[in-house]
């Protein structure tokens, strides 16, 4: 089975009494005879542990993403002096490093500083998005993540990058999630 979007892939960690819907879906697929599952940029590839005796492959669409970016954005220049790849949080850092290495440009990241003295809607609220990386002033930046839920963090990150005088700013979830 080729699944461009892995069903319930954000449901990869168990909190309280939640089910592991992604793991259950993979197990159900193998129960009906599926031996091989291919997906694109799984949110957490460790979900393959739910089906240890079956084939599970997560394909990184990095080349296709960079090719589409260069084809559709004529003003972009993938040179270290002109561009950076930015991770919006710690969870996307591996993906950003991979993209940065493939594109041959620097990488930066944000971390979410949280107030651990409060809980709002079941989470500790984010106080600020702190940037770690080289100066983005005058550079085109691509903020890359695998999924966007509400978009609130992405807006905060984009706002901070513009405050730091980044030029052209592109935000994108993985190509399989961009709709």
Predicted ranges, named:
Residues 34-36, 82-85, 169:
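Short active-site oxyanion
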């Amino acid at each position: 089975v080729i699944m461009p979007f892995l069903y319930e892939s954000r449901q990869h960690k168990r909190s309280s009494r939640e089910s592991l819907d992604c793991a259950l879906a993979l197990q159900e697929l193998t129960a009906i005879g599926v031996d091989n599952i291919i997906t694109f940029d799984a949110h957490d590839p460790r979900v393959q542990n739910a089906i240890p005796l079956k084939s599970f492959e997560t394909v990184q669409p990095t080349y296709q993403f960079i090719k589409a970016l260069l084809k559709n954005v004529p003003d972009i220049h993938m040179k270290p002096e002109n561009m950076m790849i930015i991770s919006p949080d710690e969870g996307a850092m591996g993906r950003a490093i991979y993209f940065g290495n493939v594109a041959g440009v620097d990488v930066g990241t944000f971390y979410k500083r949280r107030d651990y003295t409060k809980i709002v809607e079941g989470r500790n609220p984010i106080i600020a998005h702190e940037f770690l990386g080289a100066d983005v002033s005058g550079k085109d930046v691509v903020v890359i993540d695998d999924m966007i839920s509400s978009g609130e963090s992405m807006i905060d990150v984009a706002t901070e990058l513009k405050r730091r005088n980044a030029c052209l700013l592109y935000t994108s979830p993985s190509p399989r999630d961009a709709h």
